[in-house]
C-alpha cells in the first residue's frame, strides 16, 4: 500500500528531527544531573500525577540534591539538601534574588508590585524595609494581640454553641477566624464583604498551585488564552480590585498614634508622603499579600498540627496536659499565658517541619550567569528550594517521616532560616517577611482549640483513619476538610 504524500512528509520530518538530535554536538560544559527528558515538555512527564514537592523530592533522591529540571521552556535548578541550600542562599543569595515573572503575578499582583513577587531592586528593598520597620515589625505584630485574643474566643464560643458531640468543620472555622483577624489588623474592622473577599482569595490561591502551562511556556502567549488561564485571572482580578477599592474608599484613617495604626493606615500614610511614595495599585498589591498569604499559611499550619495530634494521641495528651496545668481553669487565654509552654512550641515546630506552608518556597530567578560548583548557570534560570525534602532529609532527621515533637527538645535549630536543615520560612533575602505574624496567628488559635476541647473523629473512627492526603495550591492544604467532634 503506497504512503500518502502527507504521511511521507511526516515520516521524513521525524527522521530528519531524530537525525539532527543524534548528530547534535555534545556540550563540553559540565552538566547538572537530571532525569530523562522529552522534547518540548522536558521533565514534566515525571511530575504528572504527583504532588509537585513530592515528585521533585523523588527525582532528587535518584539524581542528586542539586539537579536540573527542564519545565517546558524554563530551565530550572532544584536544591534538596541543607548543604546546597546553605551554599546558594548565602554565597549566591543576591545572584538568585529575583522572582520569575508569572501570569498570576502580572494580573493578580498588580504587575508584580507586591512584596512576594516584586523583582529585586530598589522598589523591593524599600518594600522589605517597610515590612521590617512598619508593617510586620515585632511591635506591630504585638499591637494586634487583642484582636487575636477576641477572635479566638469567638471561635471557642461558636464551637460551644454548636453543642458537644456534633461534628465541626474545623477547616472552615479556622480559615474564617484567621481571615477575620487579618481583616481587623489590616482595616481596623471586619469588612462587610468579608465572605466574598475570602472566597476570592481562596480562588486566587487555587489558581497559583503547581506548574501552570502559562508559566512553563511563557513565550507561547496563545497558550495563556487557549488554557483559559488569562481569562480566569482577569475575571478574578476585576472582582478583587472592586472589593479592595471599596474597602479603601470606606476606610477612615486613624488619627491616633502610630502604635494604633492598621496596616492600611500605614500604607495610606506612606502613599501620601515623600518618604516612600506608593501608588494606589501598590497599596492594593501589598494588602492582598498581607491577607491572602497570611490567611492560607496560618490556617493550613493549625489544621496540620491538629491533624497530626489526632493521629498521635500520646502527643495530644501531653500538649493538652501542659496547657490545662498552666492555665488552671482560666476561661480566656492571653498570649502571655502560653509564651513559655515548651511542648506547645515543640508541636508547632514539628508541624512546620513536616508541613512547611510553602514546600517549594517561592521560586527565585538567576539575575546573571554564574558558575556554581563548576556548573554554568544561565541568566533567567529558575531556582526551586525544596524545603519539604530538606525538612525530611533522613541524613539529618531520624525517623524523618514521623511526627515526634520531642526531637526539638535539645535541638537549637533556628526557625527563622539560620539553620539550613530546617527551613519552614525559607532563608536569605527573600525569606518570608511575615514569619512573626504567621507564628502569632498559629500559636494562640491552636492553644485555644486544644485547651478548651477534646477532639475525636466522627462516627467512631479510630485516630489512624484520619485522611492525611494533601492538596497542592499556593500552600499545601488538606485535601479533605477536617471534620472533628468536640467534647467539653
From Swiss-Prot:
One GO MF term: heme binding
Keyword Cytoplasm: no
Keywords tagged on the record: Endoplasmic reticulum, Glycoprotein, Heme, Iron, Membrane, Metal-binding, Monooxygenase, Oxidoreductase, Signal-anchor, Transmembrane, Transmembrane helix
Keyword DNA-binding: no
SUPFAM superfamilies: Cytochrome P450
PANTHER family from the UniProt entry: CYTOCHROME P450 FAMILY 71 PROTEIN, PREMNASPIRODIENE OXYGENASE-LIKE
Record-given protein name: Germacrene A hydroxylase
Provenance organism: Lactuca sativa (Garden lettuce)
